[in-house]
Swiss-Prot record:
Protein name: ATP synthase epsilon chain
Gene designation: atpC
Assembly, per entry: F-type ATPases have 2 components, CF(1) - the catalytic core - and CF(0) - the membrane proton channel. CF(1) has five subunits: alpha(3), beta(3), gamma(1), delta(1), epsilon(1). CF(0) has three main subunits: a, b and c.
GO function terms (MF aspect): ATP binding; proton-transporting ATP synthase activity, rotational mechanism
Task performed by this protein: Produces ATP from ADP in the presence of a proton gradient across the membrane.
Cellular compartment(s): Cell inner membrane
Keywords, sorted A to Z: ATP synthesis, Cell inner membrane, Cell membrane, CF(1), Hydrogen ion transport, Ion transport, Membrane, Transport
Amino acid sequence: MNTIHVDVVSAEESIFTGQARFVALPGEVGELGIYPRHAPLITRIKPGSVRIEMADGSEEFVFVAGGLLEVQPHCVTVLSDTAIRGKDLDDEKANAAKAAAEEALKNAKSDLDLAKAQSELAVMAAQIAALRKFRQKK
């Protein structure tokens, strides 16, 4: 069976390393699906869920808050400032952070404050969506 080596790395640690049959994640211009022997590619990724289909058919989920993707024919590397394993996502923390971002959006006094709040809100909305996807697959 053909597999591809996958590394998902955050600023703090390696989140996932292993062999996979397929990887799906949110690219900047749409959803990306990567199989072994994919053409080389470097692109930015949006906040969302990385779905890794293992060789045995099981799935692993990782939330990334955006980042970079490098694809080589036999290797996929996902680099993100923030990456959280699906099983480690916390509903309460995500909802509290989303509420804080919404409040910051209302109280933004400058364009920079507004942009930061919008970015944080988008990341938290993506994290909550990733959490829902992960719970559906359980």
